[in-house]
């Protein structure tokens, strides 16, 4: 099975938009990896996340702002030879993004980002109460490194390397 790099930004963004959630990798307070699924929105090279105003992941991200965010879609079990276990693979496409977390504090900016996040999941319009906006932590991660791969391709599916 082959793995190929995907470099076309429009294709990478299409993969991101197909994902219902992302996984965020943070460094915990002891220096260990901590990975958590989160709802998100993506716009113009920026990933937006939201969470409660406090808790483990917020404390970690305040201490260690560097994060890795991954997206994966299109899971399909594939094989080259049905009776050969090592020929099996999971066909999928994944995007890996790196950046630093900035917590948005401005109330109007928070509302705008919450709209962007909600647009990821629904076309409905929303209003946000002052207490609700005050009680949410809005994360902004400007992507400074992004890679994308397609895994589990049969040689006949690879058009170029």
Task: Locate the predicted segments by residue.
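Extreme N-terminal tail/first-helix region
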Residues: 1-18, 159
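Charged, gly/pro-rich active-site loop segments
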Residues: 2-3, 76-161
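Short beta-strand segments
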Residues: 19-53, 69
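Short, structured patches in soluble enzyme cores that scaffold and shape functional sites
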Residues: 26-28, 71-73, 143-145
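Beta-strand-connecting loop/turn residues
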Residues: 45-46, 65, 144-146
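Helix-adjacent hinge/juxtasegments
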Residues: 57-81, 86-88
